[in-house]
């Protein structure tokens, strides 16, 4: 007979595992905190056993890491708490510690304490924010957060708001679907085979537009890359010429993607001028502000987003500049009804009729059914820091980027690619010992890559990008970056530069 009086002990089990994991993750973060005071030297320090302490990463190539990791999954019984702790310990050990000050590689960096808490809360709730009745509080939070964020960008109509998506690429993809189904409604039923659409984006824009074109069945050939000016901003005259050319070829100009904070140089496209072209030819105007959109919280820097209020849709990803945990992205608009018209379906098993005129079953606005409530992560960060706190953090990051840029500019051994101060938080530059560029692009690229690799052994991780003179350094500063980190980075670069020439 079944034991109907059997009790669950999940809370006790969770408490036990949480305390065990806490004993691993807190030292992981603390190690990064304690290492930050040493970054100003530009090199690693030794521990009591005279071993170099690289809190950032233990670098191994894939095959070597596989051999050391020895990760397998059990065929029969699980490994229990001991096996779990062993695996978590190894994951922490062999992962990049993004909490370390030396992580300056990508547009995303570490999260922060409130970010970790938000992930725990979402894990506890483990619900789907597709229909209101299974996620009432989270649905309200997403609606309010999306509406409030939209208002910051100048979207103030009664139907303004936004939805959260799983990253900037997902937001951009959703915007393209909404654009097609809004401007050409027959596509929702019949597909787009009756049209040869043309999508326009800067040649410095993110590759997610190509991915979106593939996903929507438009193909890579539908994406037209617009040249940029010397400053990296989209050339509006060239855009207009390319639109006219596309029409002459029998194509249907559908959509222009302007970028507010390009991936490499951090440049902001001229939004007002691009909007004028979109109006002239009846195209959807989207702004990809995944990276640069967060400066809307800064009175000092938000002028770079002038014209964003004219967009039909706008992407912002707080998991980048604001250190909200990945993933957290919003697609905002002045007209959420266009999202509903483009994406809603008659699924009676899921969506039930209500007397409320406002859409609360948020899956009707998105491309997804299963969707995590990432908006909570932004909401909790906003509650914790406040808009003023976001502003201070952003202004600090820009100050650090400008300081690094000034150090580079004053040195005879480096040459800036980005202006001083940079438009966003990327500082791009070449190594030019004695003021001389290498004799070939290949040699410049070799030096750049060799220096990047050597800097990992000094506790700094950053990237490089192709340029007209070969690969150049691309260092991304973030809201947590300290002055000593910036100065230590430069000292390290000076030292490793002498080793590669």
From Swiss-Prot:
GO MF assignments: aspartate 1-decarboxylase activity; pyridoxal phosphate binding
GO terms under cellular component: cytoplasm
Positions that bind substrate: 106-108, 474
Keyword Lyase: yes
Changes seen on gene knockout: Impairs the production of destruxins.
Family listed: Belongs to the group II decarboxylase family.
InterPro entries: PyrdxlP-dep_de-COase (IPR002129), PyrdxlP-dep_Trfase (IPR015424), PyrdxlP-dep_Trfase_major (IPR015421)
Enzyme Commission designation: 4.1.1.11
Catalytic EC class: lyase
Pfam short name (any one): Pyridoxal_deC
Organism: Metarhizium robertsii (strain ARSEF 23 / ATCC MYA-3075) (Metarhizium anisopliae (strain ARSEF 23))
Keywords: Decarboxylase, Lyase, Pyridoxal phosphate
Function: L-aspartate decarboxylase; part of the gene cluster that mediates the biosynthesis of destruxins, insecticidal cyclic hexadepsipeptides which induce flaccid paralysis and visceral muscle contraction in insects through targeting the calcium channels and vacuolar-type ATPases. The aldo-keto reductase dtxS3 converts alpha-ketoisocaproic acid from deaminated leucine into alpha-hydroxyisocaproic acid (HIC), which is the first substrate for destruxin assembly by dtxS1.
Entry protein name: L-aspartate decarboxylase dtxS4
Residues recorded with modification N6-(pyridoxal phosphate)lysine: 320
């Amino acid at each position: 007979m079944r034991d109907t009086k059997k009790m669950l002990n999940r809370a006790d089990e969770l408490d036990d595992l949480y305390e065990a994991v806490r004993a691993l993750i807190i030292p992981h973060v603390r190690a990064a905190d304690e290492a930050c005071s040493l970054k100003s030297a530009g090199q690693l320090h030794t521990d009591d056993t005279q071993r170099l302490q690289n809190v950032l990463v233990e670098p191994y190539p894939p095959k070597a890491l596989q051999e050391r990791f020895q990760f397998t999954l059990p065929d029969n019984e699980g490994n229990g708490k001991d096996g779990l702790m062993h695996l978590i310990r190894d994951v922490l050990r062999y992962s990049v510690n993004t909490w370390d000050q030396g992580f300056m590689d990508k547009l995303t960096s570490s999260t922060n304490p409130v970010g970790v808490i938000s992930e725990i809360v979402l894990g506890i709730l483990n619900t789907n924010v597709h229909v209101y009745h299974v996620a009432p509080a989270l649905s309200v939070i997403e609606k309010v957060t999306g509406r409030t964020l939209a208002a910051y960008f100048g979207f103030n109509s009664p139907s303004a708001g936004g939805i959260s998506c799983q990253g900037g690429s997902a937001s951009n993809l959703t915007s393209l679907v909404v654009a097609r189904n809004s401007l050409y409604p027959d596509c929702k039923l019949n597909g787009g085979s009756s049209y040869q659409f043309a999508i326009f984006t800067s040649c410095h824009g993110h590759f997610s537009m190509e991915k979106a074109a593939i996903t929507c069945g438009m193909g890579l050939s539908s994406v037209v890359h617009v040249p940029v000016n010397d400053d990296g901003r989209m050339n509006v005259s060239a855009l207009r010429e390319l639109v006219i050319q596309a029409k002459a070829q029998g194509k249907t100009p559908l959509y222009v993607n302007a970028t507010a904070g390009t991936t490499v140089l951090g440049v902001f496209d001229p939004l007002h001028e691009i909007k004028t072209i979109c109006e002239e030819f009846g195209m959807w105007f989207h702004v990809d502000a995944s990276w640069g959109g967060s400066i809307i919280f800064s009175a000092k820097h938000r002028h770079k987003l002038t014209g964003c209020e004219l967009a039909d849709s706008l992407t912002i990803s707080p998991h980048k500049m604001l250190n909200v945990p990945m993933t957290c992205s919003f697609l905002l608009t002045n007209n959420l009804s266009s999202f509903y018209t483009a994406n809603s379906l008659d699924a009676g098993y899921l969506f039930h009729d209500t007397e409320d005129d406002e859409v609360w079953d948020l899956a009707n606005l998105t491309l997804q059914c299963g969707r995590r409530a990432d908006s909570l992560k932004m909401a909790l960060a906003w509650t914790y820091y406040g808009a003023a706190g976001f502003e201070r953090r952003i202004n600090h990051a820009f100050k650090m980027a400008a300081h690094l840029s000034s150090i580079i500019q004053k040195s005879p051994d480096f040459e800036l690619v980005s202006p001083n101060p940079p438009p966003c938080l990327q500082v791009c530059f070449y190594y030019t010992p004695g003021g001389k560029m290498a004799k070939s692009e290949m040699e410049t690229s070799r030096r750049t890559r060799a220096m990047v690799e050597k800097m990992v052994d000094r506790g700094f991780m950053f990237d490089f990008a192709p340029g007209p003179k070969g690969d150049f350094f691309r260092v991304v500063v973030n809201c947590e970056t300290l002055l000593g980190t910036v100065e230590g980075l430069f000292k390290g670069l000076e030292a490793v530069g002498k080793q590669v020439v």
